[in-house]
């Protein structure tokens, strides 16, 4: 039987990451994210973190919605569903262990893939000779 491999971030288990302070955790992150945390969280990010902590305790039962696409996924967010704004709507993002250290905005795409229809009459030079239905 194949066991699921235990998740580790830079050699630390999720439990060890949860017991770390924000400063200790920041030392494990890549430089861009580390510098972002070192500068401190913005008021919007602090508000989001407060909502997440309330929701973990069961005191906040509305869906957590945010415009903070630049918020770094922290270990305490794992298991939560956060609705991230993509410029048009709030996209539900289920936070998994593998997402730790990434930005929330990476998981809510701002552009959708263009699916072109068939070209219309006059779209090309050869379509001049096609009979119009």
Swiss-Prot record:
Name any one GO molecular function.
structural constituent of ribosome
Going by the UniProt record, its keywords in alphabetical order are:
Ribonucleoprotein, Ribosomal protein, RNA-binding, rRNA-binding
Q: Name one GO cellular component term.
A: cytosolic small ribosomal subunit
SUPFAM superfamilies in the record = Ribosomal protein S19
Disulfide feature: none
Tell me the Gene3D superfamilies matching this sequence.
Answer: 30s Ribosomal Protein S19, Chain A (3.30.860.10)
Cite a single GO BP annotation: ribosomal small subunit assembly
- Signal sequence range: none
Q: What does this protein do?
A: Protein S19 forms a complex with S13 that binds strongly to the 16S ribosomal RNA.
Family, per entry: Belongs to the universal ribosomal protein uS19 family.
Self-association and partners: Part of the 30S ribosomal subunit.
Q: What is this protein called?
A: Small ribosomal subunit protein uS19
Q: What is the lineage of its organism?
A: Archaea, Methanobacteriati, Methanobacteriota, Thermococci, Thermococcales
